Amino acid sequence: MNHQKYIRNFSIIAHIDHGKSTLADRLIEHCGGLQAREMSQQVLDSMDIEKERGITIKAQTVRLVYKAKDGNTYYLNLMDTPGHVDFAYEVSRSLAACEGSLLVVDSTQGVEAQTLANVYQAIENDHEIVLVLNKLDLPASEPEQVKQQIEDIIGIDTSEAVLISAKSGIGIDLVLEAIVSKLPPPKESSSDILKALLVDSWYDPYLGVVILVRVIDGYLRKNMRIKMMATNSVYTVENVGYFTPKKHISDVLHAGEIGFFTAAIKQVADCKVGDTITDEKKPCEQALPGFKPQLPVVFCGLYPTDSSEFEHLKDSLAKLRLNDASFEYEMESSSALGVGFRCGFLGLLHLEIIQERLSREFNLDLITTAPSVVYKIHMRDGENLEIHNPADLPDLQKIESMEEPWIKATIMVPDEFLGAVLSLCTEKRGMQLDHSYIANRAKIIYKLPLNEIVYDFYDRLKSCSKGYASFEWQMDVYEPSELVKLGILVNAEVVDALSTIVHRSRAEQRGRALCVRLKDLIPRQQIDIAIQASIGSRIIARETIKALRKDVLSKCYGGDISRKRKLLEKQKAGKKRMRQYGNIEIPQSAFIAALKIGDE
């Protein structure tokens, strides 16, 4: 098996819904990786949520055995990578494990923003790229137009593009021949000392952590003592193998191969993706380039709707963390919502997926506070802080300046929706950097504050472009900004869970919208309830929920006026006491609806 010239390591790059997982299914079927009765749609997407949303979240790998037309047997290692921007780092290290890529483009839709980001990463990794145009059987397919578009935008030669329909299986053998003939084999091993790239890891209840690796130099075998270079932790390898996509145990993984190993590792957090694995006795001198720890970008609070579920939530988060090292959380408490967790995510899709998995896999009913980002605070006394929880924001008098993160967004949109998209970006405080046309699609590059993106930007972009716009972003810089903490008071009590950090120009509009929303959601009481929005000590908006009138005289039929007066005085005293000590219960539904307000 140590014939490197017969190995091909490749990944599939595609935008969401362009047919990446379907093509992977056809390749597995064609090479006999699974029997026809074992095939299911999107074999490599192991989570239900991946199949339902049509997205890939975790990188998966599969070894295919293909007998080519030249008579040789080739071993093809397919790396199915995530396509969404939140998982860009997972994509980058999956690409680093390969020598080539299949660029799959939907011939009815053309190039999307997401595809661009991943193709440029593949080119940076010196990948050979084979262009595959999919969905050829659809009436709206325009392969020649899409080829021209790809040449104009990406600049790669499209004359040898492979035309296929993954769904109906047309052209799959052409794809396999192109992989064998056009993609290069792994480079010859330069040393016998083990050097392997940690591509991904997940938790198996029986084996502990399973680690996906690409062996660059040397070999990895059972009972070897290995060392992770980023964490300096040492383990003994228990099992070595590969996926077809079933698990196969083998004795050794040679240079150029992609496979997995287990080593009684207890948690995924110990396995940093992109780390270098080497032999403990003879370590390699230099780690592989490109490793960087993943830092959360978006934060929010997760609280159980029923406080008795707290321990269940704690256990569930710990289990999710086993499989997702980029997800972080810490305990926090709120006077309005009780005890919960402050969680950090790679982006909004990551947040949605974690939320959905908590409710689906662990049967939890949760309240999510408004998402926020990391702000840099420069204090007057010279201290510098980084905060992501509005409750931690110091008094404005003590702050010298505040900085917020900005992103660089690339948006591809059909010509007729351009006006609506430009006005949305302007409304979100965006600055246009570039604007170009490719055929009948516009490509615009905007600089936008991340704070404005985390609410509802993606949903609104999709609705104002009828779903045709695609959007990709990367972190750019931190810039000084006029930010304020918008507080919500109910009966003069601050509701910390509804506090947010907003730009001063948006504070009044957002404060009014929240007050109006809460007025409709909080049930009436026997006293007037004041709902106020404030910046510091200044009230910027107010709504009042009028009191219910409880008729205490209904049981007095006629009779003495002093009896009625006595009852009215008693009610008056009770209302006074309620105003003094009364705690207004805000229902959970009010929180959930108020937090969904975005920037309506």
UniProtKB/Swiss-Prot annotation:
Ligand binding (GTP): D17, H18, G19, K20, S21, T22, N134, K135, L136, D137
EC numbers: 3.6.5.n1
Hydrolase keyword on record: yes
One of the protein's GO biological processes: positive regulation of translation
Topology in membrane: Peripheral membrane protein
Principal place of residence: membrane
Keywords: Cell inner membrane, Cell membrane, GTP-binding, Hydrolase, Membrane, Nucleotide-binding, Protein biosynthesis
UniProt catalytic activity: GTP + H2O = GDP + phosphate + H(+)
Top-level taxonomic group: Bacteria
CDD domains given in the database record: EF4_II (cd03699), EF4_III (cd16260), LepA (cd01890), lepA_C (cd03709)
Gene3D superfamilies on file: 3.30.70.240, Elongation factor 4, C-terminal domain, Elongation Factor G (Translational Gtpase), domain 3, P-loop containing nucleotide triphosphate hydrolases, Translation factors
Pfam families, per database record: EFG_C (PF00679), GTP_EFTU (PF00009), GTP_EFTU_D2 (PF03144), LepA_C (PF06421)
SMART domains with a match to the protein in the record: EFG_C
One of the record's GO molecular function terms: guanosine tetraphosphate binding
Subcellular location: Cell inner membrane
Gene Ontology cellular-component annotations: plasma membrane
Class in the EC hierarchy, top level: hydrolase
Record domain tr-type G: where: 5-187
Disulfide-bonded cysteines: none
Entry similarity comment: Belongs to the TRAFAC class translation factor GTPase superfamily. Classic translation factor GTPase family. LepA subfamily.
PANTHER family (alphabetical): TRANSLATION FACTOR GUF1 HOMOLOG, CHLOROPLASTIC (PTHR43512:SF4), TRANSLATION FACTOR GUF1-RELATED (PTHR43512)
Function: Required for accurate and efficient protein synthesis under certain stress conditions. May act as a fidelity factor of the translation reaction, by catalyzing a one-codon backward translocation of tRNAs on improperly translocated ribosomes. Back-translocation proceeds from a post-translocation (POST) complex to a pre-translocation (PRE) complex, thus giving elongation factor G a second chance to translocate the tRNAs correctly. Binds to ribosomes in a GTP-dependent manner.
Protein name per UniProt: Elongation factor 4
Lineage of producing organism: Bacteria, Pseudomonadati, Pseudomonadota, Alphaproteobacteria, Rickettsiales
